[in-house]
Every structure is written in structure tokens, then in C-alpha cells.
A protein has these predicted regions:
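NAD(P)+-binding Rossmann beta1-loop-alpha1 motif at the extreme N-terminus of oxidoreductases
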Residues: 1-48
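Rossmann-like NAD(P)(H) cofactor-binding subdomain of soluble oxidoreductases
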Residues: 91-154
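Short acidic low-complexity segments
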Residues: 65-81
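Glycine-rich, N-terminal phosphate-binding loop of Rossmann-like dinucleotide-binding domains
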Residues: 86-89, 124, 171
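Alpha-helix C-terminal capping/helix-to-coil transition sites in glycosyltransferase folds
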Residues: 79-80, 116, 163
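Internal alpha-helical scaffold of NAD(P)-dependent oxidoreductase catalytic cores
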Residues: 132-147, 152, 158-197
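N-terminal glycine-rich dinucleotide-binding loop that anchors FAD/FMN and/or NAD(P) in oxidoreductases
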Residues: 49-69
Length: 197
């Protein structure tokens, strides 16, 4: 993809990020899918879906042909984007509770590439207080942090996302308004709410 990406999706070769990237690219955005899974990256860039996602195969080939979507393992590619959407996998401990330490620590890596005008969107389902911890990590570089959780059945995101209301909250007005404007391109209804800390 030669054009700069409007959107970078971290965890973009996973179930949540891949479908979201296809949806945004179909609305005219340039999307980079950033992920560590080299096998999925290779499949996506060759036009093959890495797992079952309804209505995705034809759409992926079309978006690649139009040069609106590509996958990479280079985190620094976020520099090219306005929006950074984070939906990386959250491991579960032996008591089946989410282990968010790795998720939180990831933002120290991301911070190296942040600019003050980035809009960072957390898509993961997280516990109260996590947004505040992340904000403390990144605020010296970027204060525009929003929380827009996904609520999609795996494998049916392309069908469901446009029909479901999207919750939008954040740490400042710019993050909230810009995130709402972005998701309004792909969702019928936006519901603004507060981050619970």
C-alpha cells in the first residue's frame, strides 16, 4: 500500500481486528493490520482469509486490489495513521480471569511511536480502571484515548457491526468526538458514555 494509512489496527490479523479492518477499508479508509502472527499476515496479503469470517473472502480480495488494506508486523507503521485501534488478544490465567498485565505493558511499546494528534481507541473488553492506567502511560506523548468496546459474535462481525449500537467513551473531548465520528461511518447508532474508573 503506497498511501498513508488512515487507520492502524493492532491485533489486526486476529478475529476482531481483521473484520474491523475490512469494514473500515470498505468505507474508503486505508487500513494497516498490525500483528505478530506472520502466518496470518502472509495469508491476508495474498488475499486469503486466515479464519472463517462470513462475507470476508471476496471483500478482502477487493480491498487488496484497491490497495486499501495490508498486513504487517511493524508496529512503527502506526506513525502513518490518524487512528490507532488496539484489539490485541488478552490471555487468561489458570483461574480463567483475564491477565491484563501484558495488555497494559504493551502501551509502553506503543508509546515510542505516538504523536500528540493520534486518536487511540481501545477495542478490548477491559476492567474498570484499566483505561486510567493506560492513560498514565501514554499521556506525555498523546492524551487522546478512547474506549469503544466490541460486542460481536466471532465470525459474524462484518454482518453484525453495522447493525449494533457502538459505545464510545474516552479521556478527553477530542478522543470521544473523533472516535464517534469514525464509528459513525460503519455503525447506525453511537452511544456516548463515561469511562468507569
Amino acid at each position: 500500500m503506497n498511501n498513508k494509512s488512515n487507520i492502524s489496527i493492532i491485533g489486526g490479523a486476529g478475529h476482531v481486528g481483521f473484520a474491523l479492518g475490512l469494514i473500515f477499508s470498505s468505507k474508503g479508509f486505508n487500513v494497516s493490520l498490525i500483528d505478530k502472527n506472520r502466518s496470518n499476515i502472509k495469508k491476508i496479503n495474498s488475499g486469503q482469509i486466515p479464519f472463517l469470517e462470513e462475507n470476508s473472502q471476496k471483500l478482502l480480495k477487493t480491498m487488496i486490489k484497491k490497495k486499501r488494506i495490508y498486513a504487517t508486523n511493524q508496529l512503527r507503521k502506526v506513525i502513518e495513521s490518524k487512528f490507532i485501534i488496539v484489539c490485541i488478544g488478552t490471555p487468561i490465567n489458570n483461574k480463567l480471569n483475564p491477565n491484563l498485565r501484558g495488555f497494559i505493558n504493551f502501551f509502553y511499546q506503543l508509546k515510542k511511536f505516538l504523536k500528540k494528534d493520534h486518536i487511540i481507541i481501545i477495542r478490548n473488553s477491559i476492567s474498570p480502571g484499566i483505561c486510567n492506567k493506560i492513560y498514565k502511560i501514554i499521556k506525555s506523548k498523546c492524551k487522546n484515548l478512547s474506549y469503544c468496546p466490541e460486542r460481536i459474535v466471532q465470525g459474524k462481525a462484518i454482518l453484525e457491526l453495522p447493525k449494533l449500537p457502538q459505545l464510545v467513551s474516552g479521556k478527553n473531548k477530542k478522543a470521544i468526538l473523533e472516535s464517534g465520528k469514525l464509528f459513525r461511518k460503519v455503525c447506525k447508532k453511537i452511544i456516548y458514555t463515561k469511562v468507569i474508573e
